Amino acid sequence: MHPIIWELSHMVDLQAAAQKLKRCYQRRVAITAGGLKHRLMSSLIIIIIIRINYLRDNSVIILESSY
């Protein structure tokens, strides 16, 4: 499992997890500007985290629409 996914899936505060995920995502896209493969990987990480947290709190689904 990706270290970011593991860390976020063990966070109790979902708002903090959402903020951390947003920062990670923005950094990845910034590092490889226009890198399609990297963007797809970032999206995959977001989808996986949504699935991990879905049963705990449906508000995490907001992340999906913000990208």
From Swiss-Prot:
<keyword id="KW-0964">Secreted</keyword>
<dbReference type="GO" id="GO:0005576">
    <property type="term" value="C:extracellular region"/>
</dbReference>
<keyword id="KW-0165">Cleavage on pair of basic residues</keyword>
<feature type="signal peptide">
    <location>
        <begin position="1"/>
        <end position="21"/>
    </location>
</feature>
<protein>
    <recommendedName>
        <fullName>Vespin</fullName>
    </recommendedName>
</protein>
<comment type="function">
    <text>Shows contractile activity on isolated ileum smooth muscle.</text>
</comment>
<keyword id="KW-0732">Signal</keyword>
